UniProtKB/Swiss-Prot annotation:
Similarity annotation: Belongs to the bacterial ribosomal protein bS21 family.
UniProt-recorded Gene Ontology molecular function terms: structural constituent of ribosome
Biased composition annotated in UniProt, kind: Gly residues: 78-88
GO CC, alphabetical: ribonucleoprotein complex; ribosome
Organism: Nitrobacter winogradskyi (strain ATCC 25391 / DSM 10237 / CIP 104748 / NCIMB 11846 / Nb-255)
Location of region: Disordered: 56-95
Keywords: Ribonucleoprotein, Ribosomal protein
Pfam families hit by this protein: Ribosomal_S21
UniProt cross-references to HAMAP family, sorted A to Z: Ribosomal_bS21 (MF_00358)
GO process terms (BP): translation
Cell wall biogenesis/degradation among keywords: no
Protein known as: Small ribosomal subunit protein bS21
Length: 95
């Protein structure tokens, strides 16, 4: 995998490399290959992933058909940290 470094901007090149690796699924594969996974565990994990995908597809289909309410869009400034320390406050209070 190659990434061009323009104007000695290594940070930008590193960001592009990480994005490519994420798209290719390299990080996920490294995590899975970090330790041995028994064939039975692999089968169970893949089955659970398939069930999750099927549920997600069914949920999206029901939302499109109007049988389920759509997920509310996040409103900035009205989240869990609103009113505690200004705009820089996150979920754990002011910085």
């Amino acid at each position: 995998m190659q990434v061009l470094v323009r104007d000695n901007n290594v940070d930008q090149a590193l960001k592009a490399l990480k994005k490519k690796m994420q798209r290719e699924g390299i990080f996920r594969e490294m995590k899975l290959r970090g330790h041995y996974e028994k064939p039975s565990e692999k089968k169970a994990r893949e089955k659970a992933e398939a069930v999750r995908r099927a549920r997600k597809l069914a949920r999206k289909k029901m939302q499109r058909e109007g049988l389920l309410p759509m997920k509310p869009k996040p409103v900035f400034g009205a989240g869990p940290g609103a009113g505690r320390g200004g705009p820089a406050a996150g979920p754990r209070g002011p910085r």
